[in-house]
Every structure is written in structure tokens, then in C-alpha cells.
């Protein structure tokens, strides 16, 4: 998993609340269990005018040329609500997004994102609104998300602080998912197991 330390990227916004996981990645695309290949289906029902996904919706934000290559998504409260499908952060990451900034997230989506290297950043509603206004007013506007200092820098240079549990921050900074975190303690695990009496093994 790619570590997340500090990322500066083109920002795009979806100015909606309660964006659920079925909107992020509709159920008909959940047949795979590998993480790749979901980006093309991200926000399928909004991005495309047809079921096959051959006709892009020119009015949808992510389809507008000015946001091509965006890696930071701004949204409103309760992002990622709905089902617990891990495919949602898979699709967002496969599309090329590194961070999602919103006032709040659904709990399960929040945890799934961290476990898949996607940084969910909680800012106040007013701070998110300022970021959205700046991104809308300037083509090519970039935002910096620095996990080492837990700060977001807006296109105009305004800085906003955010918090993240230290355990989650450690995993993201070091590119560790739950399995990777366990393996990083391999020596201690082996030492502990070597001390277990044979009759208990």
C-alpha cells in the first residue's frame, strides 16, 4: 500500500450530502474481489447517461475537462453512508483519488478508507465550503493535504487543521493495512510464539 505523507493535487467537488456507497459504486459492479478496475465504474449512475457506461454525462463534475486528473475530492456531510462495501474506497482509489475532504463520514466507510490507503479528512462545514468556493472559482486549483502536520492548505494558502487517530495515522504514513501492520510486528509475534509451551500449541 502506498504511504501517504503529503499530497498536493487537483481538487474536484461534489457539493452533495449523504453520498452513499451505492452511488459511489453501484451493486452491479461488485462481482470482483480484487481491488483494481473499479475506477471506471465510480459514480456510474451520475457519470454516464447509459447503463453500459459508454455515454459520459457532460454535466457531471468529474467529467468536466478542468477536473481531469483530480486526486482530491471535496464533498458534504455523511460521505460514504449506506452499505459496508469495501469496493467504495477501492473505486475512489482506483480512479486516482488520494484524499476525501468532508465535514463527516460514515463510520464503516471511514475505517475502510484508512485500511485501503485513502485518507478521509474531516473539516468543519465552513472550512469545506471555503475550499469548494476556491476550487470553483479557479481552474486548476490545487489543495495540499499534509498528514505529517495534519494540515490542509487551500488554493489561496489558507490552512486548516484536522485530526486523525494516531493508529490510523501510523498506518497511512507507513503504507500499512491491517495485515501489513500485523506483519510489521513479526519479530515480536515469533518471539511470543517461541515461548508458548509445546502442549499449548
UniProtKB/Swiss-Prot annotation:
Give the record's pathway.
Amino-acid biosynthesis; L-leucine biosynthesis; L-leucine from 3-methyl-2-oxobutanoate: step 2/4
Keywords, alphabetical: Amino-acid biosynthesis, Branched-chain amino acid biosynthesis, Leucine biosynthesis, Lyase
**GO MF terms, alphabetically ordered:** 3-isopropylmalate dehydratase activity
Keyword Ribonucleoprotein assigned to the entry: answer is: no
E.C. designation(s): 4.2.1.33
Q: Does the keyword Membrane apply?
A: no
Question: What Gene3D superfamilies does its record include?
Answer: Aconitase, domain 4 (3.20.19.10)
**Under the cellular component aspect of Gene Ontology, which terms does the record hold?**
3-isopropylmalate dehydratase complex
What Gene Ontology biological process does one annotation of this record name? L-leucine biosynthetic process
What is catalysed by this protein?
(2R,3S)-3-isopropylmalate = (2S)-2-isopropylmalate
Main enzyme class: lyase
Q: Which SUPFAM superfamilies match?
A: LeuD/IlvD-like
Annotated function? Catalyzes the isomerization between 2-isopropylmalate and 3-isopropylmalate, via the formation of 2-isopropylmaleate.
This protein's assembly is summarised as:
Heterodimer of LeuC and LeuD.
Family label: Belongs to the LeuD family. LeuD type 1 subfamily.
Q: Supply the name of the protein.
A: 3-isopropylmalate dehydratase small subunit
Q: What species is given as this protein's source?
A: Shewanella oneidensis (strain ATCC 700550 / JCM 31522 / CIP 106686 / LMG 19005 / NCIMB 14063 / MR-1)
Gene name? leuD
